[in-house]
Curated annotation (Swiss-Prot):
UniProt entry tagged with the keyword Transport: no
Oligomer and partners: Toxicity requires sequential binding and synergistic association of a class S and a class F component which form heterooligomeric complexes. LukEv (class S) associates with LukDv (class F).
Protein family: Belongs to the aerolysin family.
Signal peptide positions on this chain: 1-23
BP-aspect Gene Ontology terms: cytolysis in another organism
Protein name: Leucotoxin LukEv
One annotated Gene Ontology cellular component of this protein: extracellular region
Keywords for the protein's UniProt record, in alphabetical order: Cytolysis, Hemolysis, Secreted, Signal, Toxin, Virulence
Keyword Phosphoprotein assigned: no
Function: Part of a bi-component leucotoxin that acts by forming pores in the membrane of the target cells. The activity of LukEv-LukDv to rabbit leukocytes is similar to that of the Panton-Valentine leucocidin (PVL). LukEv-LukDv is hemolytic to rabbit red blood cells although the activity is only 8% of gamma-hemolysin.
Length: 306
């Protein structure tokens, strides 16, 4: 009934309205003459319904033969869930719900002198609450711990913590230049029992009558998990190394967004409600921001966005 795919366009210089803020530099001594220089960038887009809160932690360690950067990606991705009538003759009793089947988070660089050496989370995670720690020890040793609190043996550590009720986290793509995660709809608890995310009757209910609004054809807000009803608060980490003495600056693209499904509900007065589903009706609805990192001055610049 409705199919559309929107791909991310070219990253343009700053032109369209976004909100940007920068936090003050914070320096933490981590022992043995090493220190971590911390920067934070906040970039928001009303167009995409996304806020990127990105922490850039530069590790200065004379015992490590490379520059190191820990990037923690936080913020908010609005679900953009909506309910509407389907226009056209013969569709008067058909309503639709557009909702996020998947949230997308990713980091990419094309710099030949930069390598992605660690990231969190790594494996498929099905628990509602996600918590992991990335630790650093003097000399360039990065390690991950399974849960928050396991950081006593590290000179420095960063944690991730987020909630994903009814969703699972997976690494969709990973290599030395990029990592992309998908937080995907999995299984939902409904008044009728557990339902797969692929069940076409998921969220569909019978309205009180044929004159009901589009919202009445679908489950009320108190039956929708937070990632459907409001949105997702990501918390992901990547660790990058940079060849010392090569380039002064590197660029990274960080993307937050969603893939949207459409569920159609049609009321037939004699037989009742009928559901149809368009999986991945809108994909890669992502806000992509290009950041420039200066390895010498430890400055961060927002260079462009879509």
């Amino acid at each position: 009934m409705l199919a559309a795919t929107l791909s991310v366009g070219l990253i343009a210089p700053l032109a369209s309205p976004i909100q940007e803020s920068r936090a003050n530099t914070n320096i933490e001594n981590i022992g043995d003459g090493a220190e971590v220089i911390k920067r934070t960038e906040d970039v928001s887009s009303k167009k995409w319904g996304v806020t990127q809160n990105v922490q850039f932690d530069f590790v200065k360690d004379k015992k490590y033969n490379k520059d190191a950067l820990i990037v923690k990606m936080q913020g908010f991705i609005n679900s953009r869930t909506s309910f509407s009538d389907v226009k056209g003759s013969g569709y008067e009793l058909t309503k639709r719900m557009i909702w996020p089947f998947q949230y997308n988070i990713g980091l990419t660089t094309k710099d030949p002198n930069v390598s992605l050496i660690n990231y969190l989370p790594k494996n498929k995670i099905e628990t509602t609450d996600v918590g992991q720690t990335l630790g650093y020890n003097i000399g360039g040793n990065f390690q991950s711990a399974p849960s928050i609190g396991g950081n006593g043996s590290f000179n420095y550590s960063k944690t991730i913590s987020y909630t994903q009720k009814s969703y699972v986290s997976e690494v969709d793509k990973q290599n030395s230049k990029s990592v992309k995660w998908g937080v995907k709809a999995n299984e939902f608890v409904t008044p009728d029992g557990k339902k797969s995310a692929h069940d076409r009757y998921l969220f569909v209910q019978s309205p009180n009558g044929p004159t009901g609004s589009a919202r009445e054809y679908f489950a009320p807000d108190n039956q929708l998990p937070p990632l459907v009803q409001s949105g997702f608060n990501p918390s992901f980490i990547t660790t990058l190394s940079h060849e010392k003495g090569s380039s002064d600056t590197s660029e990274f693209e960080i993307s937050y967004g969603r893939n949207l499904d459409i569920t159609y509900a049609t009321l037939f007065p004699r037989t009742g409600i009928y559901a149809e589903r368009k999986h991945n009706a809108f994909v890669n609805r992502n806000f992509v921001v290009r950041y420039e990192v200066n390895w010498k001055t430890h400055e961060i610049k927002v260079k462009g966005h879509n």
